[in-house]
Amino acid sequence: MPITVEIVDVGVEERFFDEVFSYFDYVDKKFSTYKDNSEISKINRKEIQEVDFSPDMKQVFQLSEETKKITKGYFDIKSKDGQYDPSGLVKGWAIHNAAQILIRHGFVNFYVEAGGDIQAHGKNSHGENWRVGIRNPLNQEEIIKVIGLSGNGIATSGTYVRGQHIYNPHDIENKILDILSLTVIGKNVYEADRFATAAFAMGKDGIYFIEEFPGLEGYMVDKNGIATMTTGFKNNVLE
């Protein structure tokens, strides 16, 4: 997936970007279910037992189990055939960790984006909050909302780009057809990503889960193109 990093502080050198992109390469090689030699693929083939999981894999499994409990089973990295796919959590987790790399180097004004999910810090080159567009799932050329971000993260789950890749673990056989996209703003992109995935799996009820969850705001577009937003979402809207 495309990855974008922008830093507007002084003292930026190519090595800082290299470090971030190297980290994403590491994550991809470890967690990609499309790579036969990744750790997660070896786990799915039962070539690696839990006791021998790497520290990062153990952390991701722990966070996934925690998210499953919080969402009452709507987030589950284990499919019905027993295979594990932690991608619904790993992307946001990796973006958040990449942002921490830049923070440790002393950077204040930057954003990190991967596959449409974003962690933003500080201000953009105009001294304003970072501007993020939410696409219309019925017309991807159209931006239907512009959000201002600073020190928080945003993630969108949906079926309008990749098709039906998210399922309701409580009703696996039926596709999620009543909504097309659900965008979540959280204190960081990791929080936004994992709960966007879980909320989308809930269908139309997902926006109410986001409404009631502390620290999250959401924006849902249903199959008819009708949007529903949480109470505080408007506080993040620029246009």
Feature names for model-found ranges:
Residues M1-E239:
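Mature catalytic core of soluble alpha/beta enzymes
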